[in-house]
Amino acid sequence: MREEEIKKALEEKFYELYGNTEGIRYFFAPGRVNLIGEHTDYNGGHVFPCALSMGSYAAVKKREDKNFRFYSLNVEGAGVISAGEDDFTPLEDKQWAAYLKGVIWAMEKKGLEIPCGLDLVLYGNIPNGSGLSSSASLEVLMGSICKELFGLSVSFPELALIGQYSENNYNGMNCGIMDQFASAMGKKDHAIFLDTATLQFSYAPIVLKDHCIIISNTNKKHKLIGSAYNDRRRESEEALEILQKFRPIKSLGELSDEDFFALENEISDPIIRKRAKHAVLENNRTIAAKKALEEGDLHRFGELMNLSHNSLRDDYEVSCEELDTLVDAARALPYVYGSRMTGGGFGGCTVTLLEKEKKEEFKRRVAESYERKIGYPCSFYEAEVSDGPREL
């Protein structure tokens, strides 16, 4: 659906559910794809994401009381989810609207006043479970709605931090800051080079000329909560505690590759050693990839993407058969520069850099290989790099 069609669908459903549509407002917040720098954001490293043109949309209107009503066109079977002041229960709330409620809860925790409730209808065009940050998109959407409707004095980087806080503490997911920051701070045709230790960031133009970035979706649903994601964070923290005995560091992201290799044998557990190796080398690959993109060296950028995936597969162990099948099928093609999993892993999507004129052949050949091996089809999206949240 085009944006105008989405607004119309939201308005019609809003009228059907809540009656009066006078004074409703419309908002959007993007999803994101990470070009390189995976599982580095909670390790104090660098990430290199960009916001996407797909994301979450809402029609919303203030209420006169303190009640909230949420409805999603994507989860129509759930009906209207209502919440009064006493219906915000961290770590117990498992409905889709928990990502919105968590932000309201987090804002009040941070001393931002939410003076009244809202009626809201949502539509998202990020495939659920794709690893393109539908949850962060919802959090940034809710944050920007509250910022605009209630005139809250809060910056977009602060909205990203509120989204991360709510996902950690309300939804029970120990995510880093990357997803929310990429959604909140997106800039059209630019990637965000973010130092997650300091939140210092810069924009890097994505100049691909005769090349393009294709996102390939395994269509394997992943749910990070309760999966190995939180285990990886714990393992990384264990590695950091060991290495802090030998270096005055606050995060693994402070180490060079040489630092790590000089110290790696101090980590006796081979699993913990592998986790640390990924965190350190992936951070330094990300710094090198940003430089390669700025210099127009797409071959080097592609090589770094490949090394990133190999590390996520072998050292961090967050890939899966479906992701590896997509990556292997892509890399077998001579016009592909690099391919890697993107997002938390265990399913979701890959991101591939290739020659633009070959993109239809790429989709056909990868789709054939994937379905032959996995037994069901994958999907493709051309990455369209977008601005951050906005009122429509």
Language-model-detected regions and their locations in the chain:
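N-terminal cofactor/phosphate-binding cores enriched in small/glycine residues
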Residues: 37-39, 51-52
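Short Gly/aromatic-enriched secondary-structure transition segments
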Residues: 44-51, 232-233
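Short, charge-rich binding segments
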Residues: 49-51, 59-62, 111-112
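Short beta-strand->loop micro-motif that forms the acidic, two-metal-ion catalytic signature
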Residues: 347-353
